[in-house]
Amino acid sequence: MKKKPFYKVLYVQVIFAIIVGVILGHYYPALATDMKPLGDGFIKLIKMVIGPIIFCTVVTGIAGMEDMKKVGRVGGKALLYFEIVSTFALLLGLAATHILRPGVGFNIDPATLDGKAVASYAAKAHGQSTVDFLMHIIPNTMVDAFAQGEILQILLIALLFGSVLAHLGERGKVVTDFIDGLTRVLFGIVHIVTKLAPIGAFGAMAFTIGKYGVGSLVPLLKLIGTFYLTSVVFVLVVLGTIARFTGFSIIRFVSYIKEELLIVLGTSSSEAALPQLMEKLEKAGCSRSVVGLVVPTGYSFNLDGTNIYMTMAVLFIAQATNIELTWMQQLTLLAVAMLTSKGASGVTGAGFITLAATLAVVPTIPLSGMVLILGIDRFMSECRALTNIVGNGVATVVVSAWEKELDRNKLRQALTGGGEVTTTETAGV
């Protein structure tokens, strides 16, 4: 097959678009901020099909399961994995901030901080108890769940729908076949929309640099550098070790999903690449049923980048305002962060709202301290989203392996660039 010219390769186009966006934002900030609708429009096009794709993928996956106990088993294994890896992410963020101490030397007086700029985030975070979160998973109506794009609500509906179809067996085959056909149509739409990724990445990056400016990064470069370094260490060491024990290379896996990562980099939203990631994971040998359950659930329960960010940001604010946290307070912070990080969607700004919810239960640190990182949160959002999507991809491969539903031949072919295969070699770790 004839190789594509490099300028027609999607990830090359996205890289070029990001570079052009940065240049425009730096030299023509007023014009660059007007590019925001390009990024917003691309994300809206992707979000338009996320709900239906999750519904169809989960329904067909569950309907094809002969043993309904398997649904609970896969979900249980996924949640166990999420909790273990999330805890590592939270601890790594805490440890890195203690070692590198990015907030030391700021000597900020908490009384001089104006909390008005972060009041809206605090308001959104206030009062979100565990009960509220669980009740929110239940939609008012089925239509409302799709209209609002609530992933967990759609997942609940799909689980019920798929379970009933599995119970009906042959009597439900017509409906299952229809939904399977609809899935193919939806992924066809995603392929069309993905071609617009360079435009979306350009618009989002131009707006970010134009509005906030590269200069806004300078005073807080140490925090940004600490966060990016910690995230890289997490991916290479923590996820890399998990990948190695599962039988694949984290470097090759990251290379395999590079187009999705660049879309996320340009838009700062891991949701922007959700449909493409699901398709890539299936092509890499993960079973549809596992992909359909693990990926959507991971977007609320397995946000590794957000976990690193939360403990790091809280400790940074404490260091910058010269507030000493006891070990008991830090353990409380970890426990609270494990709860507040669940349900945070992979969209831009969600991490900041989650941070507000975490700070609200650590009274010794002023909520107004969030002002210190408000200006750079948008630049840290990219790294959060990138870490989140890699984490969810690895989680899906691992759970597929645990379930002995990982086609290792396909995985090997995909990660080495050998193309698709037709033989099936299903095995677990």
From Swiss-Prot:
The keyword Translocase does not apply. It is found in: Cell inner membrane. This is C4-dicarboxylate transport protein. One of its GO terms (biological process) is L-aspartate transmembrane transport. It comes from Burkholderia lata (strain ATCC 17760 / DSM 23089 / LMG 22485 / NCIMB 9086 / R18194 / 383). GO terms for molecular function: fumarate transmembrane transporter activity; malate:proton symporter activity; succinate transmembrane transporter activity. PANTHER family: AEROBIC C4-DICARBOXYLATE TRANSPORT PROTEIN, PROTON/GLUTAMATE-ASPARTATE SYMPORTER. Keywords: Cell inner membrane, Cell membrane, Membrane, Symport, Transmembrane, Transmembrane helix, Transport. GO terms for cellular component: plasma membrane. The chain crosses the membrane at residues 9-29, 45-65, 79-99, 149-169, 185-205, 223-243, 308-328, 356-376. Pfam families: SDF. Responsible for the transport of dicarboxylates such as succinate, fumarate, and malate from the periplasm across the membrane. It is a multi-pass membrane protein. The gene is dctA. Belongs to the dicarboxylate/amino acid:cation symporter (DAACS) (TC 2.A.23) family. InterPro entries: C4_dicarb_transport (IPR023954), Na-dicarboxylate_symporter (IPR001991), Na-dicarboxylate_symporter_CS (IPR018107), Na:dicarbo_symporter_sf (IPR036458). It comes from the Bacteria. PROSITE patterns: NA_DICARBOXYL_SYMP_1, NA_DICARBOXYL_SYMP_2. NCBIfam families: PRK01663.1 (NF002461), PRK13027.1 (NF009587).
